[in-house]
């Protein structure tokens, strides 16, 4: 594992050197700048984190013969009008910068590393009790709003799965054996986010 915060200051050469020193069989890339509002306000920073960094890791994976498994996002589907399960082969034009950059990363990395695996993760959540920091997630946001008597806004046009992070972890090892490509990775959800939040 790389030190916490490593990618905040690393460049491509340092990234490659670290990967070469570790010489892993698999590179599991989970880092991202995923706050969609922040990405829209800071597109250069978002591009570096969400496109350049995965490309650097792809080049390092090529040189070390490591398999790259990278987390993408269901935000690549943002703006899709089609309802129901969405196939990975759907033509996409993401409605937000974060989704656009994650899609671009998938495409560029697959050009460099056709055997790389890209997991389009849904909105994940964890629960307190493991001694780990908990970021905002749907169940905790709903609980917090209910306790404070605050309203939350959701869109009927937003169709997303919501996945318990422990299920994601349990399925990571099998995902490492997948052939190169893009995969939806998480719980399905036939409802829009208004219905899901209720």
What is each PLM-predicted segment?
Residues 63-67:
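A short helix->loop->beta-strand "cap" motif at the edges of active sites that frequently abuts
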Residues 48, 52-56, 76-119, 124-125, ...:
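Catalytic helix-loop patch of NAD(P)-dependent Rossmann-fold dehydrogenases
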Residues 171-172, 177-198:
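Mid/C-terminal beta-alpha module of Rossmann-like enzyme folds, strongest
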Residues 37-44, 79-83, 130:
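Conserved catalytic-core motifs of eukaryotic protein kinase domains, centered on the activation segment
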Residues 9-49, 62:
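NAD(P)H-binding glycine-rich loop region in Rossmannoid oxidoreductase-like domains
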Residues 110-160, 166-167:
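NAD(P)-dependent short-chain dehydrogenase/reductase
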Residues 46-47, 82, 165, 181:
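Catalytic phosphate/metal-binding cores of nucleic-acid and nucleotide-processing enzymes, i.e., regions
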Residues 27-31, 68-74, 80, 119-121:
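SDR active-site strand-loop-helix element
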